[in-house]
């Protein structure tokens, strides 16, 4: 998809701050420092729309972006970062749960994981949480450029088995460095968004 407009609308922590309207919405989740910001910047053809932090756990708000005036992307704070306090973790959990369980505009979630390593316990918990609430999920297996091509399928198999991926949930090989999987990611997203303008 050609992205002509991508800008932040609001950083929210409560439902009354979420944007109104009925635009299709895609949430983007993943472990801290997994490459989620790079994924967003790559598929939106933007170098610095989402700041790539060297400090994990930096994003503590739900960041709503409007794309081509047709849909919202929602950058969800990264999970699994050990150095945040218990109270911060509890606040994060409440904010995330509220968003995922009450947001009617949400069409699907992109879950970004690192293809180089088996999914972590936190990745499994996040995927199980999304499945519990019957939220369609697209799994982006990023950093594929860091693995020899001949080993991609082996690593993908580990991802699918560890997460116990449900039928119908796509797993897309991706690299922010090479652009691999960019088109496939958009195709997967468009299956869930109600927009017909793509």
UniProtKB/Swiss-Prot annotation:
Residues 22-195 form the EngB-type G domain. Keywords: Cell cycle, Cell division, GTP-binding, Magnesium, Metal-binding, Nucleotide-binding, Septation. Mg(2+) binds at residues 37, 59. Its cofactor is Mg(2+). Necessary for normal cell division and for the maintenance of normal septation. GO terms for cellular component: cytosol. It comes from Bacillus cytotoxicus (strain DSM 22905 / CIP 110041 / 391-98 / NVH 391-98). This is Probable GTP-binding protein EngB. It comes from the Bacteria. Belongs to the TRAFAC class TrmE-Era-EngA-EngB-Septin-like GTPase superfamily. EngB GTPase family.
């Amino acid at each position: 998809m050609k992205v002509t407009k991508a800008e932040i609308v609001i950083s929210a922590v409560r439902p009354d701050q979420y944007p109104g309207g009925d635009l299709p919405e895609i949430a983007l989740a993943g472990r801290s420092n997994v490459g989620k910001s790079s994924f967003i910047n790559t598929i939106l053809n933007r170098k610095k729309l989402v700041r790539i932090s060297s400090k994990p756990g930096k994003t503590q708000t739900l960041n709503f972006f409007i794309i081509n005036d047709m849909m919202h992307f929602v950058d969800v704070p990264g999970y699994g970062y050990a150095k945040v306090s218990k109270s911060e973790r509890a606040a994060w959990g409440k904010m995330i749960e509220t968003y995922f369980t009450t947001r009617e505009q949400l069409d699907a979630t992109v879950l970004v994981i690192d293809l180089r390593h088996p999914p972590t316990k936190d990745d499994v918990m996040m995927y199980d949480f999304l499945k519990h609430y019957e939220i369609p999920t697209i799994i982006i297996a990023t950093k594929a450029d860091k693995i020899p091509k001949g080993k991609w399928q082996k690593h993908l198999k580990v991802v699918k088995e560890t997460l116990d991926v449900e039928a119908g949930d796509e797993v897309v090989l991706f690299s922010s460095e090479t652009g691999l999987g960019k088109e496939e990611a958009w195709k997967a997203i468009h299956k869930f968004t109600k927009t017909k303008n793509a």
